[in-house]
Amino acid sequence: VGAALVCEDGSIYEGCNIENASFGLTNCAERTAIFKAVSEGHTKFKALAVVADTEGPCAPCGACRQVMGEFNIPIIIMGNLKGDIEVVSTEALLPFSFSSTDVIDK
């Protein structure tokens, strides 16, 4: 799986899956790209593309959808190696998402 994140200033950060024998510690391509960009000071994004050798367009996992929502990435482009493409919003991928507005300030 590969991902590319377009920042508001036009810079692009790429990501790949980082596998681990303990599957829970594996990091997906989408989050790798997002975390690389954030670690370099970017917090505003235009779009994220994700592609894999899958039957249909590669859909992000739930954890990636949550992170995309946290960073307000408006456009998600999902594809595969055959050229199938779906373009959706993060909101469409994660309706009724949990966000910082759901955290009660104590």
PLM region descriptions:
Residues 1, 102-103:
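Unusually extended, aromatic-enriched hydrophobic runs near protein termini
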Residues 1-7:
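Short beta-strand scaffold segments in enzyme catalytic cores
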Residues 14-102:
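Zn2+-dependent cytidine deaminase-like catalytic core
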Residues 106:
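Phosphate/diphosphate-binding glycine-rich loops and adjacent basic-rich segments that engage nucleotide
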